[in-house]
């Protein structure tokens, strides 16, 4: 394979990137330290996701942040003739958007070389036929004009990844192999984790592919439900109709679910309004809805006569569809949210889902498991979000030693947790770099399903991990001494205990919502602080905007029934209809100026994701307490401050 064109090495100096794009050749040792943690938010910033074809080439890497600089301009990779990108660890972290490798490939990139890759990004590259490698030695060999064989590029990949890359991508592979897939019928052999037991029940037998479901083995599974959101549905439709023509014969269309949850507040998004993107929003939504209508698919869309959507996808999946012991696949990295019920839920890319629409088969590379035992008793006022931010700050997780793993949460703290709180943990496995997160079903699961869905669910004998199941790592985490946590701007892994914050951080915007923090119990926590403030004659601080956004209409109705809405409005909060909103940089709650500071209950704060300002992550009570104080404080700090002034 002859790779021609320029090599762009992403380091920690913006000027070095500009010089390379201008035509200068720099060697690895001249660039120095490689830029790590390049996120998909940087490769294709959120507003660019309104494009779903080769137009994306213009926007590849336009959000790349090096320090406070963004050195890659619009269409820069195309103009420079870049064919190879080189970077450091955890390349492609963040959302599951296939737009990122699609944009790179459309811009002329043939190979991405990085010290390590995030799972979904690399799988998306495979599915598109875009090669990736962790061998930095390739860089100078390519520069010297040496041909690199496909055999060498796939040598360290699992058999399935190699087969897909050789075929030219997943759709080409699927045409030949997936339509005739049958159950693999893997027997329970030896001690297994709950995740392994679920996968073994849904694994498929693919001609020419030997799969024993051991870690690192690539294969396919059947999912009970496949869901797709509006950012990805038009791209999937475009790919499928281009490949197979129309009409399509979809596999079990009754189990395909469409969601419009990201863009229902685009008309109030500073970014979308400023850039004049509303016509593109409408076109994208029209394409999404047309695909649903053409094939008779369920679509949970925008509310009629009011702002917002019916629900955020993950929140509704757990409220209405997911069940213990089953498999759910969705085109969003936070699909593991449903793992709180004890199902195997994982995020996939657009081509993965497009192929699954046709065949019912979802690509899965089996992963190692990490057991996270939460010990002790969680102190009053400390939440699952605080636990998640603490886990993200652990060196083991920050250094990527659990990358691509299955996180199983257990221990007395989990046993005492509600499903809403468990979902915060499984949801944020995405930020931990995991494949999925799971909690074994128990009496709380049964209670939740009966109370929320009217289901009398019976837990089957096999729905637990065996005592001697094998784990790559076991993390014992003592929650007894845990206090409110924060994540400093730039990365959810920038965790710091609020008690250790040695500076006063004034707040301009406070946001509570998203799939992570828009559930019933989250609103119980918001209300606890708001009611205390109201009872003590307090409201949100001058010049602070507080936005609270429910995850589903059921959560909104829950708040109405309990009288929460009156309290929230009385302290000065603006209530928003269900939508991803500010978390997706698509609605009220995002910053408009670089000097603005936001405190948010969302799940990630990568550069540029919440607007040009600085985003601090926190728990629901800390968000509302900070809005009232006008600076970052815990609820306890707020109460102490109020009694001493």
Model segments located where?
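Fe-S-dependent hydro-lyases/dehydratases of central metabolism
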Residues: 1-645
């Amino acid at each position: 394979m002859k790779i021609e064109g320029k090599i762009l090495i992403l380091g920690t100096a913006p000027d070095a990137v500009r010089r390379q794009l201008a035509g200068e050749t720099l060697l690895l040792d001249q660039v120095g330290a490689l830029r790590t943690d390049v996120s998909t938010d940087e490769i294709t910033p959120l507003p660019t996701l309104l494009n779903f074809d080769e137009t994306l080439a213009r926007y590849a890497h336009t959000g790349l942040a090096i320090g406070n600089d963004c050195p890659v301009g619009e269409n820069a990779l195309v103009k420079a003739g870049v064919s190879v990108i080189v970077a450091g660890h955890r390349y492609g972290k963040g959302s599951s958007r296939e737009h990122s490798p699609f944009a790179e490939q459309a811009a002329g990139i043939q190979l991405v070389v990085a010290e390590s890759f995030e799972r979904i990004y690399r799988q998306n590259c495979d599915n598109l036929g875009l090669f990736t490698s962790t061998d930095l030695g390739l860089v100078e060999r390519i520069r010297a004009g040496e041909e690199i064989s496909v055999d060498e590029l796939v040598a360290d990949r699992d058999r399935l990844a190699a087969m897909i890359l050789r075929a030219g991508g997943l759709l080409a592979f699927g045409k030949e192999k997936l339509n005739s897939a049958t159950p693999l019928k893997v027997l329970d052999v030896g001690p297994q984790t709950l995740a392994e037991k679920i996968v073994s029940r849904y694994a498929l037998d693919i001609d020419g592919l030997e799969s024993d479901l051991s870690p690192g083995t690539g294969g396919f599974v059947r999912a009970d439900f496949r869901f797709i959101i509006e950012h990805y549905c038009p791209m999937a439709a475009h790919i499928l109709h281009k490949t197979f023509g129309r009409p399509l014969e979809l596999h079990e269309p009754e189990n395909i679910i469409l969601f419009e949850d990201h863009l229902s507040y685009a008309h109030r998004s500073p970014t979308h309004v400023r850039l004049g993107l509303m016509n593109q929003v409408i076109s994208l939504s029209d394409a999404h809805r047309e695909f649903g209508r053409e094939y008779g698919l369920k679509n949970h869309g925008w509310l009629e006569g009011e702002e917002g959507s019916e629900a955020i996808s993950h929140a509704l999946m757990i409220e209405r569809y997911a069940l213990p012991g089953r498999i759910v696949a969705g085109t969003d990295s936070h699909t593991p949210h449903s793992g709180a019920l004890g199902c195997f839920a994982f995020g996939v890319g657009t081509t993965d889902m497009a192929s699954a629409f046709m065949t019912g088969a979802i690509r899965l590379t089996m992963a190692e498991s990490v057991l996270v035992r939460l010990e002790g008793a969680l102190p009053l006022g400390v939440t699952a979000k605080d636990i998640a931010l603490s886990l993200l700050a652990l060196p083991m997780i920050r250094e990527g030693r659990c990358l691509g793993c299955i996180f199983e949460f257990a221990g007395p703290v989990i046993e005492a947790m509600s499903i809403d709180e468990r979902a915060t943990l499984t949801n944020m496995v995405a930020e931990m770099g995991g494949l999925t997160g799971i909690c074994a079903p128990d009496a709380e699961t049964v209670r939740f399903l009966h109370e929320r869905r009217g289901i009398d669910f019976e837990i089957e004998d096999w729905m637990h991990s065996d005592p001697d199941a094998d784990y790559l790592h076991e993390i014992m985490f003592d929650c007894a001494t845990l206090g409110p946590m924060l994540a400093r701007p730039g990365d959810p892994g920038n965790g710091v205990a609020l008690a250790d914050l040695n500076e006063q951080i004034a707040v301009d915007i406070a946001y509570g919502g998203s799939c992570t923090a828009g559930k019933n119990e989250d609103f119980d926590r918001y209300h606890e602080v708001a009611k205390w403030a109201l009872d003590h004659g307090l409201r949100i601080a001058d010049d602070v905007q507080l936005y609270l956004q429910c995850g589903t209409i059921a959560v909104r109705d829950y708040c109405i029934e309990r009288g929460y809405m009156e309290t929230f409005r009385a302290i000065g909060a603006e209530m928003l209809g269900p939508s991803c909103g500010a978390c997706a940089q698509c609605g009220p709650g995002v910053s408009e100026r670089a000097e603005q500071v936001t405190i948010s209950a969302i799940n990630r704060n990568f550069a540029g994701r919440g607007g040009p300002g600085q985003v601090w992550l926190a728990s629901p009570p800390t968000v509302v307490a900070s809005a009232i104080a006008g600076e970052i404080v815990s609820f306890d700090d707020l109460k102490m401050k109020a009694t001493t002034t």
